[in-house]
């Protein structure tokens, strides 16, 4: 009887130890799974910093063969030059565990932009090779995760390369001072500026603000004459199709012209150098006679004034005289088709 009691007590203690061990093993698996979820790109224990100055590659372990199971690997590529970017190109031999419901849940490779933490992409399966990825700065992060089931082959290989910064053009169209340029070369340099302030800074770097302000001081001259001609209101009639043909056939339309060429002035520079004017254009497809013998010509021409900056060489000394002036350019108000042997189309 005593022996039977000892056997029962020993069995109970053994069962308790077995249950404790099983529970401990289960807790360890859960803890491992939890750690695996947290060991992302933010966990420095799994991150390997790779300093690069040229081309190279990284790949899954044992590439191009079956990669190991239950892994988390992170590479952070850092270019030596801070002004460059990094481009990633995936090898055509790409294959990881297939996605589930089009989501890469188990085995995948992921690329992250460290500057803002955004994920550029996550890929798995073997159907399509991922496209090229480019960093915003001089570093980029790559993460590879495999779970404990169904490893695949060949894994992945990523080739990295350095993208040099693009050379930006200088804001000044000419590095030479205005006094060293001929008038034609200076005209080309002046035309390249996009704002009046940039132009005056180039012409007078030491006193550009004074010169700019003096251009707009009130004078006794009437500057900036702008004569606007009202457009004739269109009368709607039943023959709408014919009116549309007239509208887009021989009609006044915008043309850009060079002021120097229009005024035949080679001794002066104007800014802006080109302006929009109305000039007759289009075809004469609906003329009454042979249309090949018809030409679209202006029927009414007017002069309109445009205020521009005028630059003229000073007499006897170096430098340019700067002033706002009005230039008169021809505008075509009305057009007509003139055919050979007939006054109208």
From Swiss-Prot:
Proteolytic removal of the N-terminal CUB domain releasing the core domain is necessary for unmasking the receptor-binding epitopes of the core domain. Cleavage after basic residues in the hinge region (region connecting the CUB and growth factor domains) gives rise to the receptor-binding form. Cleaved by PLAT and PLG. Sumoylated by SUMO1. Keywords: Cell membrane, Cleavage on pair of basic residues, Cytoplasm, Developmental protein, Disulfide bond, Glycoprotein, Growth factor, Membrane, Mitogen, Nucleus, Secreted, Signal, Ubl conjugation. Pfam families: CUB, PDGF. GO terms for molecular function: growth factor activity; platelet-derived growth factor receptor binding; protein homodimerization activity. Induction: Expression decreased by hypoxia. Up-regulated by EWS-FLI1 transcription factor in tumor-derived cells. Up-regulated by IL13 overexpression in the lung via STAT6 and EGR1. Elevated expression induced by coxsackievirus B3 infection in immunodeficient mice. Overexpressed in the renal fibrosis. Expression in the lung is significantly increased after bleomycin treatment. Down-regulated by retinoic acid and gonadotropin. The keyword Ubl conjugation applies. Residues 24-33 have a biased composition (Polar residues). InterPro entries: CUB_dom, Cystine-knot_cytokine, PDGF/VEGF_dom, Sperma_CUB_dom_sf. Gene3D superfamilies: Cystine-knot cytokines, Spermadhesin, CUB domain. Residues 34-45 have a biased composition (Basic and acidic residues). Glycans are attached at residues 25, 55. One of its GO terms (biological process) is positive regulation of cell population proliferation. Growth factor that plays an essential role in the regulation of embryonic development, cell proliferation, cell migration, survival and chemotaxis. Potent mitogen and chemoattractant for cells of mesenchymal origin. Required for normal skeleton formation during embryonic development, especially for normal development of the craniofacial skeleton and for normal development of the palate. Required for normal skin morphogenesis during embryonic development. Plays an important role in wound healing, where it appears to be involved in three stages: inflammation, proliferation and remodeling. It is linked to Involved in the development of myocarditis and subsequent fibrosis in the experimental model of coxsackievirus B3-induced chronic myocarditis. This is Platelet-derived growth factor C. It comes from Mus musculus (Mouse). The gene is Pdgfc.
């Amino acid at each position: 009887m005593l022996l039977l009691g000892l056997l029962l007590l020993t069995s109970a203690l053994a069962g308790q130890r077995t249950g404790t061990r099983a529970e401990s093993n289960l807790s360890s698996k859960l803890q491992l799974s939890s750690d695996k979820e947290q060991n992302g790109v933010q966990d420095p224990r799994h991150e390997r910093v790779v300093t690069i100055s040229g081309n190279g590659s990284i790949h899954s372990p044992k590439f191009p063969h079956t990669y190991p199971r239950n892994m988390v690997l992170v590479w952070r590529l850092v270019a030596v030059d801070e002004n460059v970017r990094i481009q990633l190109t995936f090898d055509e031999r790409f294959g990881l565990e297939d996605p589930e419901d089009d989501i890469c849940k188990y085995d995948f490779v992921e690329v992250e932009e460290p500057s803002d933490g955004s994920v550029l992409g996550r890929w798995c399966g073997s159907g399509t090779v991922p496209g090229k990825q480019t960093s915003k700065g001089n570093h980029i992060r790559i993460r590879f995760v495999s779970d404990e089931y169904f490893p695949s082959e060949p894994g992945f290989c990523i080739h990295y390369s350095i993208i040099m910064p693009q050379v930006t053009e200088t804001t000044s169209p000419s590095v030479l001072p205005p006094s060293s340029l001929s008038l034609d070369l200076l005209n080309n340099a002046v035309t390249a500026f996009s704002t009046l302030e940039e132009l005056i800074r180039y012409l007078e770097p030491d006193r550009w603000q004074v010169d700019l302000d003096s251009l707009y001081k009130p004078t006794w001259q009437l500057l900036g004459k702008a004569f606007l001609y009202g457009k004739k209101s269109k009368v709607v009639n039943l023959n709408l199709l014919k009116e549309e043909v007239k509208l887009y056939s021989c009609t006044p339309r915008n043309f850009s012209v060079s002021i120097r060429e229009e005024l035949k002035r080679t001794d002066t520079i104007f800014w802006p150098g080109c302006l929009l004017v109305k000039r007759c254009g289009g075809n004469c497809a609906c003329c009454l006679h042979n249309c090949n013998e018809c030409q679209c010509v202006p029927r009414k021409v007017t002069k309109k004034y445009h205020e521009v900056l005028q630059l003229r060489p000073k007499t006897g000394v170096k430098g340019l005289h700067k002033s706002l002036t009005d230039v008169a350019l021809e505008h075509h108000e009305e057009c007509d088709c003139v055919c050979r042997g007939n006054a109208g189309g």
